[in-house]
C-alpha cells in the first residue's frame, strides 16, 4: 500500500456520529447564526448528512432552522464567500 491509500482508508473507516445526540441537544435555535454556519457551505447551501454526520431527525431540524434564519434575515440565501 502506498501512503495515499492508507490515508484514504483511515478517512473511510472513521465513525461518524451525531453531535446533537452526543451533546444531548434537543432544540436547535434558529436565532444563533454562528452555530448554524457550521452546517452551511461557503455558498450558503445546507450541507448534507453524509458530510456533517448528523442523524436524519436532527438534519431535518437543522435544515428547518437554517431556512427560518434565512427567512428573517440572519443568514443570507446565496453568497460568494460566507466563511
UniProtKB/Swiss-Prot annotation:
Gene3D superfamilies: Ribosomal protein S18
Disulfide bond annotation, renumbered to this chain: none
Key words of the record: Ribonucleoprotein, Ribosomal protein, RNA-binding, rRNA-binding
Keyword set includes NADP: no
Any GO CC annotation of this UniProt entry: cytosolic small ribosomal subunit
PROSITE patterns the UniProt entry points to: RIBOSOMAL_S18
InterPro entries noted in UniProt: Ribosomal_bS18, Ribosomal_bS18_CS, Ribosomal_bS18_sf
Biological processes, Gene Ontology terms: translation
SUPFAM superfamilies given in the database record: Ribosomal protein S18
MF GO annotations: small ribosomal subunit rRNA binding; structural constituent of ribosome
Self-association and partners: Part of the 30S ribosomal subunit. Forms a tight heterodimer with protein bS6.
NCBIfam families (alphabetical): S18
PANTHER family, per the entry: 30S RIBOSOMAL PROTEIN S18, SMALL RIBOSOMAL SUBUNIT PROTEIN BS18M
Family statement drawn from the similarity comment of this UniProt entry: Belongs to the bacterial ribosomal protein bS18 family.
Role description: Binds as a heterodimer with protein bS6 to the central domain of the 16S rRNA, where it helps stabilize the platform of the 30S subunit.
UniProt protein name: Small ribosomal subunit protein bS18
Organism encoding this protein: Cytophaga hutchinsonii (strain ATCC 33406 / DSM 1761 / CIP 103989 / NBRC 15051 / NCIMB 9469 / D465)
Lineage of source species: Bacteria, Pseudomonadati, Bacteroidota, Cytophagia, Cytophagales
Originating gene: rpsR
Amino acid at each position: 500500500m502506498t501512503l495515499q491509500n492508507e490515508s484514504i482508508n483511515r478517512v473511510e473507516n472513521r465513525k461518524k456520529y451525531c453531535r446533537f445526540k452526543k451533546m444531548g441537544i434537543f432544540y436547535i435555535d434558529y436565532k444563533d447564526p454562528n452555530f448554524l454556519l457550521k452546517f452551511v457551505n461557503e455558498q450558503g447551501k445546507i450541507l448534507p448528512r453524509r458530510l456533517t454526520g448528523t442523524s436524519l431527525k436532527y438534519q431535518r431540524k437543522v435544515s428547518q432552522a437554517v431556512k427560518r434564519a434565512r427567512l428573517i434575515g440572519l443568514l443570507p440565501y446565496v453568497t460568494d464567500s460566507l466563511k
